[in-house]
Amino acid sequence: MTRDLALAHLTTITLSPAEMIRVAARTGFQAVGLRLIQVTPTSPGYPLMDDPASMRATRSALRETGLRVHDIEFVKIEPGLDVSSLESFCAAGAALGASRIIAAPYDPDLGRLADRYAALCALAAGYGLGVVLEFFPWTVVPGLAEALEIRRRAGAPANGGVLVDALHFYRSGSRLADLDGQDASVLPFLHLCDAPARGGD
C-alpha cells in the first residue's frame, strides 16, 4: 500500500503557496500543506482568504501540477481566540480542496482549550474540514496522551483528531503504547521530520 506525501509549508516557508506547490510537484510530492495564518513575527503566513490574486495564483498552480492541498494551518488556540473569526479561513480551505486544519494548544485553561477545540471542529465541519490538534513539548499539551485527553474533553468530535509529529512525539516522551488501539480517524496523518530525536543544549 502506498500513501501520499504532502510537503509542509514550514519546510519552504519563504516561498509563496504557488511557488511552493510547483517545488513540491518537481520533487515528487502528491500534496501540500499551506500556512494561511502567520505564527510568529519572523515566520511568514500567506492569508489567501484576504488576497484574491494570490488565491487565484495558488489554484492555478494546483491545476497546473495536479497536486492537492492536504491541510491548512496554523490556528493557535489562545485565551482570546474568537473561533467565529476563522470563518473566512475555513472557507478558503474549502475552496482549495483541503481536508484538514492544524491547530495548536496555547491556552493554559484546559477546559477552555477543549471548548475552543470543539467549537473549531464544529465550524470546520460546515466546510467539510477536519481539525487536528498538534501537541508540542513546550505547551500545556506536551504529549500524545494529553492531546487525546483534550479531544475527549471536547466531546470526541467526529471530525476532530490529533496530529503526531515524529519530532515532538519523541521529544515529549510520548509512548508508542499510546498509539495502540487508536482509530485512524483520530490520528489521520503524521508529520515526518529528520531532526535529531533529542534537542541540543
Model features per residue range: what roles?
Residues S43-P44, L81-D82, R112-L113, G143-L144, ...:
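Short Asp/Glu-rich motifs
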Residues R3-L7, A119-D201:
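Acidic/histidine-rich catalytic cores of soluble enzymes
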Residues P17-A18, V83-L86, A114, L144-A145, ...:
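Conserved strand-to-helix beginnings and helix N-cap segments that scaffold or border functional pockets
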